[in-house]
């Protein structure tokens, strides 16, 4: 079971990024496979925020185009949205206290807590996930 970080979704969509070709090929393989894929709500929001922002991408995606990508992904059988369960806060709190991290890594800690709570491995090009004890992190672009 894989939990996908926003950076891989952004790389898979934005053709101007150097990671695009590799990320797109990986994402298409995942979507056509049988492994259970979770996308956290926070990553959906990050995808929308970043891909539609003209200060980040020129040209940015229109809101309609960004939403169409998300709808397409969510229509795939192995894909589901992932929300925190009842044990999420305890796991997140422990990760933050164990690592002494918060600030810019708070969202990463939230994603790590989702993965630990629900049995996922985090797939991300962000190697900061290695900092969280007990979390399985895979960078599919480093292979």
Where are these regions (language model features)?
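Acidic, PIN/NYN-like endoribonuclease modules and their adjacent C-terminal/linker elements
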Residues: 1, 112-143
């Amino acid at each position: 079971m894989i939990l996908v970080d926003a950076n891989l979704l952004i790389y898979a969509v934005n053709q101007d990024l150097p990671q695009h070709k590799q990320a797109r090929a990986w994402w298409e393989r995942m979507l056509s496979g049988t492994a259970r894929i979770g996308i956290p709500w926070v990553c959906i929001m990050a995808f929308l925020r970043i891909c539609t922002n003209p200060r980040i991408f020129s040209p940015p995606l229109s809101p309609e185009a960004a939403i169409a990508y998300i709808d397409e992904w969510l229509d795939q059988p192995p894909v589901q949205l992932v929300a925190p369960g009842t044990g999420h806060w305890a796991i997140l709190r422990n990760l933050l206290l164990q690592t002494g991290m918060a600030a810019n890594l708070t969202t990463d800690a939230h994603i790590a807590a989702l993965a630990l709570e629900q049995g996922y491995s985090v797939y991300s090009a962000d190697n900061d996930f290695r900092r969280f004890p007990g979390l399985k992190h895979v960078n599919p672009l480093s292979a």
